[in-house]
Swiss-Prot record:
Naturally occurring in which organism (per UniProt): Shewanella denitrificans (strain OS217 / ATCC BAA-1090 / DSM 15013)
A GO BP annotation: ribosomal small subunit assembly
UniProt keyword terms in alphabetical order: Cytoplasm, Ribosome biogenesis
Name of the protein in question: Ribosome maturation factor RimP
Residue spans crossing the bilayer: none
Amino acid sequence: MATIESRLVEMLTVPVEALGFELWGIEFVHAGRHSIVRVFIDSEKGIFIEDCAETSRQVSAVLDVEDPITTEYTLEVSSPGVDRPLFTAAQYQAYIGEDAKVQLTMPVAGSRNLKGVISKVEGQILTLNVDGKDLIIALDNIRKGNIIAKF
């Protein structure tokens, strides 16, 4: 069964791309009777507040017609930011050599929260170097992954 996030990605990719943006990813946070739908968009030129507003109007219209969410929800549209979330194998691949943190569904090496360097991505398998040790993590075991911003 497809997750709500995957259904939303399928539903919203074309409308977001029609506006000239990349649909970076979607987070669906279920909080009781109210939920949050976070839509992350990106562009080579960067993302501005007007881009978020335009995308929000378009996404809202699609969600109103398709009605995929049965609870009340708040729609948030933003850029991925400097600590960008990672959703796909291609996104992890693009950040090989960068520091990242991941929250896991099932523990790896006794932990559900890991910080390390993305060292390899093969298919749907991520290798994260944590304290000098390579840990193998299935991407479908990652609940949430983010780049750790360096300043």
